[in-house]
């Protein structure tokens, strides 16, 4: 039992599920009576999602619709970092939503400090945009996972490479 066990804490999401959720939202926008004539567009790139519509009312409706579709696809709403609402050309409004992937360095340092303070038998190392948590006992690792699940973290956390 001298070997150390470990797991990684990452923050990621399934890109294909997000593509499917955005596609479902686009289809519902074309069918909904209150959004049919708004000429709303949803543009998804690897890092951002841009909503372009005719009024703030329809923007709020599209954001709510998008959040519903994303939640039904078992994606966390914490992946969205909403930018401010901008006025676009032709009396339109635009909102750019940044997609959060990976742990920021500040969040990784904060989580690392919390884990070290709470659990003395556990070692934590920051590896890029992930945390590696290791300990001799798998029970210690399980308690760390439970502790992190109870914390209110501004990013969705997944636990991978459990060995």
From Swiss-Prot:
Tell me the Gene3D superfamilies matching this sequence: 3.30.70.860, YajQ-like, domain 2
Keyword Transmembrane helix attributed: no
Q: Name one Pfam family in it.
A: DUF520
Q: Which UniProt keywords apply?
A: Nucleotide-binding
**Nucleotide-binding is among the record's keywords:** yes
One term under GO cellular component: cytosol
Which terms does the record give in the GO molecular function aspect?
nucleotide binding
Q: Which domain of life is it from?
A: Bacteria
> What does it do?
Nucleotide-binding protein.
NCBIfam families according to UniProt: PRK05412.1
Annotated PANTHER family: UPF0234 PROTEIN YAJQ
Tell me which family the UniProt entry assigns to this protein: Belongs to the YajQ family.
Q: What is this protein called?
A: Nucleotide-binding protein Synpcc7942_0865
**Organism annotation:** Synechococcus elongatus (strain ATCC 33912 / PCC 7942 / FACHB-805)
